[in-house]
Design a protein with these regions (language model features):
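C-terminal transmembrane helix pair
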Residues: 177-183, 243-246, 355-360, 370, ...
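Transmembrane alpha-helix interface/packing and boundary motifs in multi-pass membrane proteins
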Residues: 58-66, 148-158, 200-210, 305, ...
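Alpha-helical transmembrane segments of multi-pass membrane proteins
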Residues: 107, 139-153, 179-206, 232-241, ...
């Protein structure tokens, strides 16, 4: 019998595509949740939906299987259990409802558009151009990487693709060219510093544009929901609100990191030569790169609603429509082809997992779970005797620093943000609600600085071996606090100047 059991376990380890122990933990957790008494104020179906949602989040955190598979599992269980409807037909309609959400398709199409950056080589060229102009000192290279991130951010909704797939290879090549190699114990010459710049530029720029990271449209949806659509963050409004505090963080970040993790090599005149040599090797702009530049220009003009400003509101275009226009331009010009679209796995993966999380968030709201949890949280804060200012600060800090327990920004936002926003909307006076909401919006990307597993970019950069775990966490905490202070002081004043509140 022991031999047969060992054989069965060996089969599972070799053939079954999920991690056995995390899967068992997740299953036990689901059963445990379903066996608990239904809390007062919730229906049995609503509590079952809570169990499914929390189990999905746990499965994502434990990485039982890829996030897309876990999301599809959640959709299947929601449909099978009929927790959102009285019929199977209604339940499957609910489970698939969010796949028609324009915000989700905005991210999917923008990922497809961003594929052109890598295919044409324009992303690499942009990075090398900035380094060729700013790279005479190590800090200057840091600024070059930061500006590269800023330029690419509006068009690359996968911060992982941007920071890990475009900027990080450039950073590694530069570090290697100066003899900074973790395998040789020389990572602190330059690589540690540049890796941290690579990471923190990625998180800062992720918060500056709706289309800079995948969960941002979900944040927009939550903010609109808790304000009954009175505060709807358009692409332009988001970018304008985050412009000054975001640029301030981006300008200070390379200097701060040069103090927190100083590079041993300060002057790097050869970096300019390296970048110029690579640019010469690449040659002049290709036709594909020119089309990409033109397409990005069109996207920026349309996302900024300039036609509507000039010709009137009849020319206003939804951001998702604009993204489709950009994708169509790239396809009909041959810059990318249909096979590129089909093979961009991250886009279709995002459609599934993002759709499932949005769907469950919507159903939790419809079934009264969010209102129930928000009331519990609100009552707890009120019973503590906190004023609204302290309550607002506590909500922001709890939300941001609870990210230590999450390995996915999307999972964290899906699990907690709507409830925290709802509580804030109930406690903060109406005239001060907008700055609170915008601080929560900023915190949703600032928290990505904290750990080496905080977002998809983190393990890519950390895995290169240039930064130790202790350094990563220490620098991440300090930068998180500094960025929160910048947004809380400069950001709030900037939003007041803009007339947002």
């Amino acid at each position: 019998m022991p031999d047969r059991l060992k054989a069965v376990l060996a089969y599972f380890q070799q053939s079954v595509p999920f991690r056995l122990v995390p899967a068992a933990i997740t299953t036990v957790f689901l059963v445990f949740m379903l066996l608990l008494p239904v809390p007062d104020g919730l229906t049995p179906k609503a509590w079952a939906l809570v169990a499914i949602f929390l189990t999905t989040i746990l499965a994502i955190i434990l990485k039982v299987m890829p996030i897309g598979v876990m999301a599809m599992m959640a959709m299947t269980i929601v449909a099978l259990s009929q927790v959102t409807s009285t019929s199977s037909k209604g339940a499957i309609a609910d489970a698939l409802s969010s796949l028609a959400n324009p915000l989700i398709w905005l991210i999917v199409v923008a990922i497809l558009v961003s594929r052109g950056l890598k295919k044409t080589g324009l992303g690499q060229r942009i990075g090398l151009m900035f380094i060729s102009r700013l790279g005479r000192k190590t800090v200057g290279i840091g600024y070059g990487l930061a500006v590269c991130e800023l330029v690419l951010a509006p068009f690359t909704p996968s911060n992982t693709a941007r920071g890990g797939g475009i900027v990080h290879p450039i950073m590694k090549a530069i570090a290697s060219a100066f003899g900074s190699d973790p395998a040789k114990g020389t990572e602190r010459k330059m690589g540690t510093y540049l890796s941290l710049v690579n990471m923190h530029a990625n998180t800062i720029t992720s918060g500056m544009f709706i289309t800079a990271t995948a969960p941002n449209p979900l944040v927009v949806d939550y903010v609109a929901r808790v304000t009954n659509q009175s505060l709807h963050l358009s692409w332009t409004t988001w970018a304008l609100c985050m412009l000054l505090p975001g640029l301030t963080c981006l300008l200070l970040m390379p200097l701060l990191l040069s103090v927190l993790a100083p590079p041993e090599v300060k002057a790097t005149p050869d970096a300019v030569d390296y970048a110029r040599t690579e640019l010469q090797r690449m040659g002049p702009l290709s036709g594909g790169e020119r089309v990409m530049i033109g397409t990005f220009g069109i996207l920026l003009v349309l996302w900024a609603n300039l036609p509507a400003m000039v010709f009137g509101p009849a020319f206003t275009l939804d951001p998702t429509v604009v993204a489709f226009v950009g994708l169509f331009i790239l396809i009909i010009t041959g810059t990318i082809d249909w096979d590129d679209v089909l093979s961009e796995k991250s886009a279709w993966d995002t459609l599934i997992w993002f759709g499932a999380l949005v769907m469950m968030a919507e159903q939790l709201n419809k079934t009264g779970v969010i209102a129930w949890f928000s009331a519990l949280l609100k009552n707890g804060i009120v019973s503590a005797g906190l004023g609204w200012e302290a309550a607002a600060a506590l909500l922001v800090l709890l939300f941001v620093f609870s990210h230590y327990f999450f390995a996915s920004t999307t999972a964290h936002i899906s699990a907690m943000m709507l409830a925290f926003l709802t509580v804030g909307a109930a406690l903060v006076p109406p005239q001060y609600l907008t700055p609170f909401l915008l601080m929560m919006v900023a915190g949703s990307t600032i928290m990505m600085t904290l750990t080496h597993y905080a977002t998809g970019t983190s393990p890519i950069i950390f895995g290169s071996g240039y930064v130790t775990l202790g350094t990563w966490w220490r620098v991440g905490f300090v930068m998180c606090v500094i960025e929160l202070v910048i947004y809380a002081v400069l950001g709030v004043m900037w939003w007041k100047l803009l007339g947002i509140w």
